[in-house]
Amino acid sequence: MKTNYIFVTGGVVSSLGKGIAVASLAAILEARGLKVTIMKLDPYINVDPGTISPIQHGEVFVTEDGAETDLDLGHYERFIRTKMSRRNNFTTGRIYFDVLHKERRGDYLGATIQVIPHITNTIKQRIIECGEGHDVVLVEIGGTVGDIESLPFLEAIRQMAGEVGRDHTLYMHLTLVPYIKAAGEVKTKPTQHSVKELLSIGIQPDVLICRSDRAVPSNERAKIALFCNVSEKAVISLKDVDSIYKIPALLKSQYLDDYICERFSLKCPKANLSEWEQVIYQQANPVGEVTVGIVGKYIDLPDAYKSVIEALHHAGLKNRIAVNICLIHSQDVETRSVKILQDLDAILIPGGFGYRGVEGKIMTAQYAREKQIPYLGICLGMQVAIVEFARHVAGMPEANSTEFVSDCKYPVVALITEWYEENNNRKLSNLGGTMRLGSQPCKLTYGSLAYQIYGKTIIMERHRHRYEVNNMLLKQIEAAGLRVAGLSEDYKLVEMIEYPAHPWFIASQFHPEFNSTPRDGHPLFTGFIKAASEYQKKQLNKM
């Protein structure tokens, strides 16, 4: 079967939820038995988002093959079963980087390199390669129509219709239809102007998704269809909802999937959304409620911890517990003391880089350990737990990570190239100083709490870090009571730790949040929320 392409653009304003809309449509098509994948094309010049500040761009989502990608790929994986890879996300910077590399290598045989055809051809080639073996590829174009940065992508997708055939391409445009309170009606003019802008580029949209805070009336949809030259049944109202997991059903109720399958001549059964109905039911009918504190330094933009926040809510679904999330700046712990943590039912320290706020995280880990509060540390959250335990239990008062103090007396966390043999000779490794990225196997210690949670010995989880627990100091830490619960496949690197003297104190070097989905959850987060509920009950019994 020939691959079909759905190109999704945005208009009027940004942040309308284009990624969620794309993922929701993909979920419906997948529920019809189609093999679906999604791409995100980002117009910024960075080669990838790996070095962009989380405060500016949100989290970096890591794929199984180790690509550092846009957070929208996290939405894609949470809505469909297909796993994303480095092929599913690229930027303007990556395209130019690759084209210039080829030019320097002489691949273009001295030709003058231009946006058309060299840049656009590279974009089209990547789209076609990603679509191989799939029935439908949804391609989300980042940014807003009219932005200068998006023009090469828009030109490339315009050309795609001529290359793969108009019968196998569909252009979908998502716009804002604002409600004007003073007039008491929605206004369609911004959508008309946005479509006009798209037409000037040579793209006639086939489907319009109208975002609004309320349902767009049928007469207004008919007006949009008339002025924008779109079929009336292809003008879809997408109102605000209290849960993003209601959007697949909302789109299906307007027969968007039927329209697309008819357009592509796809013969497939009706979508079965029973799994999503179950998710919505669990979300609407909790039997309990807990408060989890996320202690980090990027809390000014919650999207910096998007996958962690979503994973906590997924765990709440599995436990039928509503999860209230309290974002706490780690520097506030330093300046205002750990008292700001006292009303929490559980504490999570997520990943991060840099020294700012790290002492507040160490104080938080100590508070959770001493007060017997359920604790989940992720990446840096595991490293600060190691540092805290070494300082206050294992007899290493000056313990630290070399990321923060390069010449510390007890470098319990360090680059592998900074580990020292007992005779003080540097132990070198070709792994040192490199970022560990992507999915890697971890061997769990039989009988550990981690083993009980996962229910198996070998697990696969995704990594994004440079620093590791220093094996040269590990024996002293273990002798003080901390348990290594998981090791890398070669038994050389610590992947998980736990504290047996605590009811639920676990930390991982990997990022389990990237494998959590609303339909399946994740065992580590599910166990964490269950422990939070049990802790809450114990505290109530003490009153």
Swiss-Prot record:
Residues 291-538 form the Glutamine amidotransferase type-1 domain. Catalyzes the ATP-dependent amination of UTP to CTP with either L-glutamine or ammonia as the source of nitrogen. Regulates intracellular CTP levels through interactions with the four ribonucleotide triphosphates. The keyword Ribonucleoprotein does not apply. The active site is at C379 (nucleophile), H511, E513. GO terms for molecular function: ATP binding; CTP synthase activity; glutaminase activity; identical protein binding; metal ion binding. This is CTP synthase. GO terms for biological process: 'de novo' CTP biosynthetic process; pyrimidine nucleobase biosynthetic process. L-glutamine binds at G352, L380, G381, M382, Q383, E403, R466. GO terms for cellular component: cytosol. Homotetramer. CTPSs have evolved a hybrid strategy for distinguishing between UTP and CTP. The overlapping regions of the product feedback inhibitory and substrate sites recognize a common feature in both compounds, the triphosphate moiety. To differentiate isosteric substrate and product pyrimidine rings, an additional pocket far from the expected kinase/ligase catalytic site, specifically recognizes the cytosine and ribose portions of the product inhibitor. Its EC number is 6.3.4.2. Allosterically activated by GTP, when glutamine is the substrate; GTP has no effect on the reaction when ammonia is the substrate. The allosteric effector GTP functions by stabilizing the protein conformation that binds the tetrahedral intermediate(s) formed during glutamine hydrolysis. Inhibited by the product CTP, via allosteric rather than competitive inhibition. CDD domains: CTPS_N, GATase1_CTP_Synthase. It catalyses: UTP + L-glutamine + ATP + H2O = CTP + L-glutamate + ADP + phosphate + 2 H(+); L-glutamine + H2O = L-glutamate + NH4(+); UTP + NH4(+) + ATP = CTP + ADP + phosphate + 2 H(+). Residues 1-266 are annotated as: Amidoligase domain. Belongs to the CTP synthase family. Mg(2+) binds at D72, E140. Pathway: Pyrimidine metabolism; CTP biosynthesis via de novo pathway; CTP from UDP: step 2/2. CTP binds at S14, D147, I148, E149, K187, T188, K189, P190, T191, Q192, K223. InterPro entries: Class_I_gatase-like (IPR029062), CTP_synthase (IPR004468), CTP_synthase_N (IPR017456), GATASE (IPR017926), GATase1_CTP_Synthase (IPR033828), P-loop_NTPase (IPR027417). Keywords: ATP-binding, Glutamine amidotransferase, Ligase, Magnesium, Metal-binding, Nucleotide-binding, Pyrimidine biosynthesis. UTP binds at S14, K187, T188, K189, P190, T191, Q192, K223. ATP binds at S15, L16, G17, K18, G19, I20, D72, K239, D240, V241.
